[in-house]
A protein has these predicted regions:
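Enrichment for repetitive, rod-forming helical segments
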Residues: 13-14, 233
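Sec/Tat signal peptide C-region and signal peptidase I cleavage site
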Residues: 22-26
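Eukaryotic scaffold repeat domains enriched in small/polar residues
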Residues: 27-338
Length: 338
């Protein structure tokens, strides 16, 4: 795990302007240059505690970091363990120190996947083993459950390994569904299905593993179409608007818009699983890709041997109000970019 790198802070230059050649996205052209550094020793867990893989991360309205961990549970290739994880799976962390402020979710989830925190501080979670989508209060009280526990399906009452949730200002929400299905569903705030779209394939509005969903300020729905190696854009009615595709973008696992007032304002950050074998650090070329609104690749960081202190394999990401970037994957990391 590269112990020599754990004792140092690695850095990389990140350019926040479109580049002439997207394949060379790590090389500067003109404009302001940022340096991204992973914060060593973050997060800070209690003695004897371990994260395991962290599948989701978000920043809540109070500025705390909320993480969804698997706590040692492994996703085997041929089956999913349906036994609830005994340890707390949702951790609320101090953004500065990385200390755990509170933890909940013990005995409730079998294979954590997506995590979103809405403007009211509610926590939305998906479990790909249980085929369910949940809404919790900030303190862990369950407010809404969608899907039949452990039962996959394609109708309005079932999911097949749902991967993520995006919540609109009006309280309605979108679900990416997922590993078994190839669709996006739009629900009213009370859980009524409003519409859905998508099927399997590589054409516009078709998907090969819908791995995440996000909403843009202009009213567009952004979908991480992982195995088609692209991000698709739709209007709120599900009509195809366009796509992001580039030699510099591999498999998009998740994406988040840059908050106003941060260096990332107006840009998108994409958790890129790279190409080749996701579990082969030497081949995957995984990292975080910075994308302009028009789809131009601006930069990339969080790469092993460049600015990540240990293997990371980004699976999800979030941006704090101060511009700090939190990357979840094999572990949880914090990057400061200035």
């Amino acid at each position: 795990m590269l112990p020599s790198l754990r004792r140092a802070v690695c850095s990389a230059a990140v350019l926040l302007v479109p580049l002439a050649a997207p394949r060379l996205a790590a090389q500067p052209a003109a404009g302001a240059l940022l340096t991204c550094r992973e914060v060593p020793g973050w997060p800070r867990l209690a003695a004897g505690d371990t994260l395991g893989m962290v599948s989701g991360v978000a920043v809540d309205p109070a500025g705390h970091v909320v993480a969804f961990r698997r706590a040692g549970r492994r996703w085997e290739s041929d089956t999913l363990d349906m036994t609830p994880i005994a340890r707390p799976t949702v951790l609320v962390l101090d953004a500065g120190s990385g200390a755990v402020l509170r933890a909940w979710g013990a005995g409730q989830f079998a294979m954590p996947h997506g995590l979103t925190v809405d403007r009211a501080g509610n926590v939305w979670l998906t479990d790909v083993a249980l085929n369910q989508v949940y809404k919790f209060s900030a303190t862990g009280q369950r407010l809404l459950t969608l899907g039949e526990r452990g039962v996959p399906g394609r109708d309005a009452a079932h999911f097949d390994m749902p991967t993520g949730v995006a919540v609109a200002e009006d309280g309605s929400f979108y679900v990416s569904d997922g590993y078994g299905n190839a669709r996006v569903l739009h629900f009213a705030a009370d859980g009524r299905l409003l519409r859905q779209w998508g099927d399997s394939g590589a054409g516009p509005g078709q998907f090969r593993l819908v791995h995440g969903v996000a909403l843009g300020p202009e009213g567009r729905v952004y979908v991480a179409d992982r195995e088609n190696e692209r991000v698709q854009l739709f209007d709120t009615a599900g009509r195809f608007v366009g796509e992001w595709r580039s030699d510099a973008l591999g498999k998009p696992f998740a994406l988040v818009g840059g908050p106003a007032g941060t260096p990332w304002a107006g840009a998108w950050l994409v958790a890129d699983g790279g190409r080749g074998d996701y579990f082969d650090d030497a081949r995957a070329r995984s990292g975080v890709v910075v994308v302009a609104p028009d789809g131009a690749i601006r930069a990339r960081f969080a790469e092993l041997g460049r600015d990540a202190l240990a293997p990371l394999r980004p699976h999800a990401l979030a941006v704090g109000g101060d511009g700090a970037v939190y990357v979840a994957g094999l572990r949880l990391a914090k990057f400061i970019c200035r």
